[in-house]
């Protein structure tokens, strides 16, 4: 384990002493260090009647147990302090470590022995081997009462609200959209779990079209066959209009009642970060949105009608919209428990909705935590004029996603009444998708949140993985740079795939978010501020560094690609084409081994480099016909240890999200030997070689100069490493599979790779 502590806040000494005293650690600033440590430890072991026993089973050094040490005349030393501290954090002395000073350096332990009271205070705020901070572990065990009131420690809310005796209710928010054109505003179901409290509390909201269930069978039937020819497009410039949103006004009167009338029972799933905040005094709201089970309307996936309906939930929390007790719309209930302040959470589609909500500039949305969220839907299902699929899901497109998320069809009555209209709406969607050309058009323009990024007022926290080929890193990169300069923005850029990171051992993500939300939603005045970029170092396990920016580098490193011309044959023998189509993983393996139709160029790294931004290929290229699909991947090549893209379980159900509440696995990205690691990749329709909005002819056998930017990333390379550039046509995981007989030729002498460093 390595310690990477970003959540700790430096407080004045008087605050430290006061907070310690409130937790029963009655330490005196004038006492000697040894006496203070003993006083601290006897309170620490509050679950024991006889505190001599737990002291006797800890060690001060290799020859002395801690009780014997306290009974001796020996002085407290730095070595003894560290030895005790590591044991309190769950490390076994003489098993996990033998020399505390060596272990301190190996783990990057954040505490430097000096002022003992401040050391002990920071120790309580440090994560244990099993994933909780020490103070959270003690609170979970009953250090302070579960009194349904707020208690703070180091600028973070503690788990002092009951997660057993909570209010579980359902309301139906009246949205400002009428997606199915029935002349009535759509209703959106809101599932609420909130702690009991006499005053007003903030809300954690997760906007998830998946929450009420998904129609997997209908979605699977809607998948597309990827084996189609690349379309030869007519040259033209794409014209677009400003997206429009038509809102509807509230209708009718509704009796105001004191409380919701529908009780929330079982929910399909919760997000463990939300579970963590519930006993800390934050309401949990789960909203599936229009077109989902128990709500009304069509599934409009990604457009501002869908976003508006989610926004209206925040409006209700602030008294600007109504919520009914049921579908009759006869009785309404106010969110009189809400302080109006909201943070949004969730990954993938959930993080996408956070991005979209932020771009409305809605009052009350204080923080978004957008994890692996889409910023422009075109870049999810298309790329540079090509029809593509999100990584791992070949054949998926917008209409199959609509079938997946239109969970109203899971209710037989809704299916009978509404499926015909839903299918008619889907036909319109299919026509607008333009799966034939892969071009950007008005349909995608209406689902581009970057156009409204200037409206964002909330503080923004992103998480994204360098190995996320589902929602590719371009999404967070573009959103990060499109945000107004005056707002606070932060990015946790890890080396995983499309995954959550709130339960990783190496980073205090939950505690950092706690510090942020306690400040922004609960009004605690602290100077807590996350760095702009927190980046997971790819060269070592469990190592995180603070960076000033993502991209925007002034310097670059250029690699020439060779001296000759090389060709990429597009067509495969039928046997190989069928084999790769059945299992794209086989294609990826053979591509990395140099066995596919490809140009492979090994590039020695002659000095240490820190890639930060978008690698760019400048290629002189020609096609043997009037079309061309170009794929590129940049690998670090060579057998060595690399971080793996999916977290592994270190210990099962050891993270406590409250007081024995929603126990969670502790995980981490493994660091183990592999033959290569993907650094970045990209895909390009050569007819869109100069601009996404400009379609140009390709003349057979005529040279073209192409500037091709790959996916943004942050990646460290060392002198002696090897980069491998792979150029090819069809990618059996991502692109359409055109097996026509043509080839691309690259003049390597007139081509180069540029890395921003």
UniProtKB/Swiss-Prot annotation:
Residue numbers annotated as active site: 348, 468, 498
Reactions accelerated catalytically: Hydrolyzes Xaa-Pro-|- bonds to release unblocked, N-terminal dipeptides from substrates including Ala-Pro-|-p-nitroanilide and (sequentially) Tyr-Pro-|-Phe-Pro-|-Gly-Pro-|-Ile
Keywords in alphabetical order: Aminopeptidase, Cytoplasm, Hydrolase, Protease, Serine protease
GO biological process, one term: proteolysis
Subcellular location: Cytoplasm
GO CC aspect terms: cytoplasm
Pfam families documented for this protein: Peptidase_S15, PepX_C, PepX_N
Gene3D superfamilies with a match to the protein in the record: 1.10.246.70, alpha/beta hydrolase (3.40.50.1820), Galactose-binding domain-like (2.60.120.260)
Listed PANTHER family: COCE_NOND FAMILY, PUTATIVE (AFU_ORTHOLOGUE AFUA_7G00600)-RELATED (PTHR43056:SF10), PEPTIDASE S9 PROLYL OLIGOPEPTIDASE (PTHR43056)
Function text: Removes N-terminal dipeptides sequentially from polypeptides having unsubstituted N-termini provided that the penultimate residue is proline.
NCBIfam families cross-referenced by the UniProt entry: PRK05371.1-4
Family: Belongs to the peptidase S15 family.
Official protein name in the record: Xaa-Pro dipeptidyl-peptidase
Organism this protein belongs to: Streptococcus pneumoniae (strain ATCC 700669 / Spain 23F-1)
Upper classification of the organism: Bacteria, Bacillati, Bacillota, Bacilli, Lactobacillales
């Amino acid at each position: 384990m390595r310690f990477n502590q970003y959540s700790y806040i430096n407080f004045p000494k008087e605050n430290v002493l006061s907070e310690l005293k409130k937790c029963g650690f009655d330490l005196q600033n004038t006492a000697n260090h040894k006496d203070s440590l003993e006083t601290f430890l006897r309170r620490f072991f509050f679950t024991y009647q006889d505190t001599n026993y737990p002291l006797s089973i800890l060690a001060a050094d290799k020859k002395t147990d801690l009780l014997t040490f306290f009974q001796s005349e020996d002085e407290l030393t730095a070595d003894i302090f560290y030895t005790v501290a590591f044991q309190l954090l769950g490390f076994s002395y003489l098993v996990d470590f033998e020399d505390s000073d060596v272990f301190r350096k190996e783990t990057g332990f954040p505490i430097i022995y000096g002022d003992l009271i401040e050391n002990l205070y920071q120790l309580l705020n440090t994560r244990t081997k099993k994933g909780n901070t020490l103070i959270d572990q003690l609170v979970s065990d009953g250090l302070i009462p579960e009194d349904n009131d707020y208690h703070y420690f180091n600028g973070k809310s503690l788990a002092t609200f009951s997660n057993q005796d909570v209010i579980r209710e359902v309301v139906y928010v009246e949205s400002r959209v009428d997606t199915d054109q029935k002349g009535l505003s759509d209703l959106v179901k809101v599932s609420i779990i909130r702690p009991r409290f006499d005053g007003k509390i903030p809300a954690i909201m997760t906007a998830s079209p998946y929450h009420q269930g998904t129609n997997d069978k209908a979605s699977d039937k809607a998948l597309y066959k990827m084996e189609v020819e690349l379309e030869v497009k007519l040259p033209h410039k794409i014209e677009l209009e400003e997206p429009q949103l038509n809102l509807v006004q509230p209708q009718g009167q509704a009796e105001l009642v004191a409380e919701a009338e529908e009780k929330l029972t079982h929910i399909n799933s919760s997000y463990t970060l939300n579970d963590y905040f519930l006993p800390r005094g934050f309401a949990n709201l789960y909203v599936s949105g229009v077109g989902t089970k128990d709500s009304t309307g069509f599934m409009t996936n990604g457009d501002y009608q869908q976003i508006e309906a989610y926004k209206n939930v925040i409006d209700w929390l602030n008294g600007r919209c109504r919520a009914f007790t049921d579908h009759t719309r006869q009785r309404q209930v106010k969110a009189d428990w809400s302080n109006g302040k909201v943070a949004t959470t969730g990954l993938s589609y959930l993080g996408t909705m956070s991005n979209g909500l932020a771009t409305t500039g809605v009052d009350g949305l204080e923080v978004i935590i957008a994890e692996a969220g889409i910023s422009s839907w075109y870049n999810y299902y298309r790329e540079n004029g090509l029809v593509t699929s999100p990584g791992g899901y070949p054949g998926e497109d917008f209409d199959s996603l609509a079938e997946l998320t239109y969970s109203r069809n899971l209710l037989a009555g809704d299916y009978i009444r509404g499926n015909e209209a839903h299918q008619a709406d889907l036909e319109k969607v299919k026509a607008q998708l333009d799966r034939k050309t892969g071009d950007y058009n008005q349909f995608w323009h209406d689902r581009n949140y970057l156009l409204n990024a200037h409206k964002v007022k909330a503080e923004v926290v992103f998480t994204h993985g360098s190995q996320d080929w589902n929602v590719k890193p371009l999404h967070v990169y573009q959103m990060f740079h499109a945000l107004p300069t005056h707002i606070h923005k932060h990015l946790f850029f890890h080396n995983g795939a499309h995954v959550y990171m709130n339960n990783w051992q190496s980073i205090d993500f939950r505690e950092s978010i706690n510090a942020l939300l306690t400040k922004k939603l609960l009004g605690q005045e602290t100077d807590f501020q996350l760095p702009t970029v927190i980046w997971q170092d790819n060269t070592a396990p469990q190592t995180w560094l603070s960076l000033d920016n993502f991209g925007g580098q002034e310097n670059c490193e250029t690699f020439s690609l060779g001296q000759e011309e090389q060709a990429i044959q597009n067509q495969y023998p039928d046997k190989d084409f069928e084999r790769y189509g059945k299992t794209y993983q086989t294609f990826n393996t053979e591509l990395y081994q140099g066995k596919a139709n490809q140009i492979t160029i090994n590039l020695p790294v002659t000095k240490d480099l820190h890639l930060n931004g978008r690698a760019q290929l400048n290629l002189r290229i020609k096609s043997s016909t009037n079309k061309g699909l170009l794929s590129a991947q940049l690998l670090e090549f060579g057998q060595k240890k690399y971080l793996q893209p999916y977290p592994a379980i270190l210990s099962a159900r050891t993270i406590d999200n409250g007081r024995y509440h929603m126990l969670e696995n502790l995980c981490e990205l493994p660091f183990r030997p592999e033959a290569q690691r993907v650094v970045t990749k990209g895909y390009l329709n050569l007819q869109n070689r100069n601009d996404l909005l400009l379609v140009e002819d390709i003349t057979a056998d005529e040279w073209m100069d192409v500037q091709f930017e790959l996916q943004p990333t942050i990646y460290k390379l060392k002198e002696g490493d090897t980069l491998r550039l792979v150029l090819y046509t069809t990618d059996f995981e991502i692109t359409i599979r055109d097996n026509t007989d043509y080839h691309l030729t690259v003049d390597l002498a007139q081509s180069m790779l540029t890395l921003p460093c």
